[in-house]
Swiss-Prot record:
Single biological process term from Gene Ontology: photosynthesis
Membrane topology: Multi-pass membrane protein
Name of the featured protein: Photosystem I assembly protein Ycf4
Keyword annotations: Chloroplast, Membrane, Photosynthesis, Plastid, Thylakoid, Transmembrane, Transmembrane helix
A Pfam cross-reference name: Ycf4
Intracellular or extracellular location(s): Plastid, Chloroplast thylakoid membrane
Parts of the chain that traverse the membrane: 22-42, 57-77
Similarity-based family: Belongs to the Ycf4 family.
One GO cellular component term: photosystem I
Species this chain originates from: Lemna minor (Common duckweed)
Presence of the UniProt keyword Ion transport in the record: no
Length: 184
């Protein structure tokens, strides 16, 4: 969802609360929980789940390895759920022509630098740059070239925009900021 008027353009950025992240966090949690239960049932010698009889899996070495994979998977799953809970990477890009300020805001991990804010003058924006990498994994990223800051990505690398959508977005933003477009 974006909001735009004559003087202000606000573009909201979706963070880690995407359907694919929910899907992978659930799959990883359930899979690692299954590994941990099978490893634990082989250690106890009792069937905690009826799918695998505990007599078929000996604790040393299969049970230990499955328990290790289960614990490691639970740690990775908890990391994914934490990023979803904190909505890491979400935020907004605000371009204010009236005040001449560009503000890029993102949420990070909890701590001292939870709020990531970049503010600079609109006159420092030199150009809008479109990077296209063709091949097996096509990647199209929109950058903003800022004097003294370097290039700042405006789109995520996992956003699968068509070439037409990317060109449209770059043209609209360059027109709004009154800067040229560069492509490479």
């Amino acid at each position: 969802m974006n909001w735009r008027s004559e003087h202000i353009w606000i573009e909201f950025i979706t963070g880690s609360r995407k359907t694919s992240n929910f899907f992978w966090a659930c799959i990883l949690f359930l899979g690692s929980l299954g590994f941990l239960v099978v490893g634990t049932s082989s250690y106890l010698g009792r069937n905690l789940i009826s799918v695998f009889p505990s007599q078929q899996i000996s604790f040393f070495p299969q049970g230990i390895v499955m328990s290790f994979y289960g614990i490691a998977g639970l740690f990775i799953s908890s990391y994914l759920w934490s990023t979803i809970l904190w909505n890491v990477g979400s935020g907004y890009d605000r371009f204010d022509r009236k005040e001449g300020i560009v503000c890029i805001f993102r949420w990070g991990f909890p701590g001292k630098n939870r709020r990531i804010v970049l503010r600079f003058l609109m006159s420092d924006v030199q150009s809008i740059r479109v990077e296209v990498k063709e091949g097996l994994y096509t990647r199209r990223v929109l950058y903003m070239e800022v004097r003294g800051q370097g290039t700042i990505p405006l789109t995520r690398t996992d956003e699968n925009l068509t070439p037409r959508e990317m060109e449209q977005k770059a043209a609209e933003l360059a027109y709004f900021l009154r800067v040229p477009i560069e492509g490479f």
